A protein has these predicted regions:
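Signature of extracytoplasmic/envelope-associated structural regions
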Residues: 1-295
Length: 295
């Protein structure tokens, strides 16, 4: 039998997700949702192999799998909504649509350019979520996470209800209006902004198994950067007085999508550079926030 390599163009079902009824377990009739526009995804599996050495020889006696397998995933996509990103951003305790719920990730490709093959990862939780916006460009979201199990891909249709590939227009920075970022209620001409949310996942191993018993979030850390056209002394005053403003990033005014950062400390003025070739003076800041809420 001859085989042929395939590329990403052989994707049949783009990456999608469904909430699990309990950790690592899908409900009886799961309905999957699209992650976003043309997601790029990478899966990794590290069995944590350990060589066992033996006296009197340079060769190992055996190589064994030790702790729970480390299964990770890395997704980059252009959002058309905020559904998937909410799992990485919003606080615990909110139930469905938050990190309280673990996810199953699914996609399919035509292996050998012929046979549809389903790739499934169970028990997924996001660890790092980064949302980036730049003037004149689509928003980009990157989510890196961990999972409980990564079964051998199957060529038998699981029979789930699948999402169709997203055909909506990706969100751009301009979709938040002329001034999509406000700080303490005042609008600013933002040129770029990034919000990073770390969930510091902890893997709980289980005796007699190479799969994690559960992966749970711990402390949430919210950091980021932004650049503003220098027009007032407002932000330098906030930096100098160590004020803690509320920042609201309107991702899409039409869709009612916002990202609110509370008790925000400006941790650094990264740059305020003066060069004759620059079209405008930009003040660039780093910040850390106490809480974040994505709608």
């Amino acid at each position: 039998m001859s085989t042929v390599p395939i590329g990403a163009w052989m994707t049949v079902k783009e990456l999608q997700y469904a909430e699990e009824s309990s950790y690592g377990v899908l409900p009886g009739s799961p309905v999957f949702n699209s992650v976003g526009y043309e997601p790029r995804v990478m899966f990794r599996v590290d069995p944590k192999m350990l060589p066992i050495y033996q006296p009197g020889t340079e060769d190992t006696e055996t190589i064994q799998s030790a702790a729970a397998r480390e299964i990770t995933w890395d997704i980059v996509y252009r959002p058309t909504d905020t559904g998937f990103a909410k799992y990485g951003v919003n606080s615990q305790g909110g139930g469905s649509g938050t990190i309280d719920k673990s996810l199953t990730l699914l996609m399919s490709v035509k292996l050998n350019a012929a046979t549809e093959t389903w790739i499934i990862l169970n028990g997924a939780r996001p660890e790092t979520t980064s949302i980036t916006g730049r003037a004149g460009a689509n928003l980009e979201i990157r989510v890196i996470g961990k999972g409980q199990s990564f079964p051998i891909p199957t060529q038998t249709d699981p029979g789930y209800t699948y999402a169709t590939s997203s055909s909506a227009q990706p969100i751009q920075l301009k979709d938040g209006g002329l001034t999509p970022l406000s700080i303490d209620g005042l609008p600013y001409d933002v040129t770029n902004i990034t919000v990073n949310v770390e969930r510091n996942l902890s893997t709980i191993a289980q005796p007699g198994s190479h799969s994690a018993m559960i992966i749970i979030p711990q402390n949430r850390q919210i950091t980021g950067t932004f650049g503003i056209a220098w027009e007032t002394l407002g932000l330098l005053t906030i930096l100098g007085t160590l004020a803690a403003p509320t920042m609201v990033w309107t991702l899409s005014a039409a869709l009612g999508l916002t990202l609110t950062l509370n008790v925000t400390q400006f941790t650094k003025l990264n740059s305020l550079s003066f060069a004759s070739e620059d079209p405008a003076l930009i003040e660039n800041y780093a910040y850390q926030a106490s809480t974040a809420s994505l709608t």
